[in-house]
Amino acid sequence: MNLQKFSRYPLTFGPTPIQPLKRLSAHLGGKVELYAKRDDCNSGLAFGGNKTRKLEYLIPDALAQGCDTLVSIGGIQSNQTRQVAAVAAHLGMKCVLVQENWVNYHDAVYDRVGNIQMSRMMGADVRLVPDGFDIGFRKSWEDALADVRARGGKPYAIPAGCSDHPLGGLGFVGFAEEVRAQEAELGFQFDYVVVCSVTGSTQAGMVVGFAADGRADRVIGVDASAKPAQTREQILRIAKHTADRVELGRDITSADVVLDERFGGPEYGLPNEGTLEAIRLCAKLEGVLTDPVYEGKSMHGMIEKVRLGEFPAGSKVLYAHLGGVPALNAYSFLFRDG
């Protein structure tokens, strides 16, 4: 496998720490050891997160093409668009963000706080569009790219989640390589890695990265899209493409993609009672915050899998914390009493 042949622009602090979740593990019976890899703490650029890790491989391509404007898309409380805005500000580039109405949630401040507030503060041209949720290519995004060109700019197209991009899976191939180096220092291997999945390239990159030592199917994706068939297809397609790009040496098959579909409902961006319980439990036991859209759902999935005995006793499970906490501000009514 050859990740080193790709240019990488440093936007993160370096390898992210792995933290034992001792109190949460004990609360759940102590038979499974839980750890978190803190990609939510990976950068000083507007809180960072998993998209910042991905953007390290997209930015050299944007600079090589002489682009002057980063154009991306997400929901109103998109972590993706906030991280793209931060990187654009850091590099002195312009930024156009299409923010669609992906979440069926209504709050007086939903489009004024959290991620979208930060994007505006960092100088991004934020464009609210009423279209609903989908993880495919969007006309509103294509229109924004065309508008930049019409105004004489040179846009660089960054799709939702950085996912459906030729380089979108590389960052999390690097995540797997990073974990392997940390495992050597820790003196043990993780039996499972739990990760949230929606647009697919985070899990796809991990699948490829961990396939290098035979652990592709130990990456347990937790769907948060509530459209798991679409998410699964995208993970597999991106993983196949990424495996070819990094010269993995074997094909990625559907057996390599494990996606738990039980925790994504009722809809994308709407937490269920299990999501909210997991958010509160992790906060109170560990001081680790997760959000209602993504990490709360993957945390719920991990907790429930421990409770149901789906991880064998003695397992060491690594939770990939991808970020997303700024969105908590947009759901403040749900947490008005803690």
Curated annotation (Swiss-Prot):
- Active site residues of this protein: 78
GO annotation terms (biological process):
1-aminocyclopropane-1-carboxylate metabolic process; amine catabolic process
Q: Which reaction does it catalyse?
A: 1-aminocyclopropane-1-carboxylate + H2O = 2-oxobutanoate + NH4(+)
> Which cofactors does this gene product need?
pyridoxal 5'-phosphate
Could you tell me which residues carry N6-(pyridoxal phosphate)lysine? 51
Give the record's keywords alphabetically: Hydrolase, Pyridoxal phosphate
Enzyme Commission designation: 3.5.99.7
Q: Which GO terms describe its molecular function?
A: 1-aminocyclopropane-1-carboxylate deaminase activity; D-cysteine desulfhydrase activity; pyridoxal phosphate binding
The answer to whether UniProt assigns keyword Hydrolase to this entry is: yes
As for family, the record states: Belongs to the ACC deaminase/D-cysteine desulfhydrase family.
- Which PANTHER family does this entry report, sorted A to Z? 1-AMINOCYCLOPROPANE-1-CARBOXYLATE DEAMINASE-RELATED
Reported function: Catalyzes a cyclopropane ring-opening reaction, the irreversible conversion of 1-aminocyclopropane-1-carboxylate (ACC) to ammonia and alpha-ketobutyrate. Allows growth on ACC as a nitrogen source.
Q: What does the record note on quaternary structure? A: Homotrimer.
Name it.
Answer: 1-aminocyclopropane-1-carboxylate deaminase
Lineage of the species this protein comes from: Bacteria, Pseudomonadati, Pseudomonadota, Betaproteobacteria, Burkholderiales
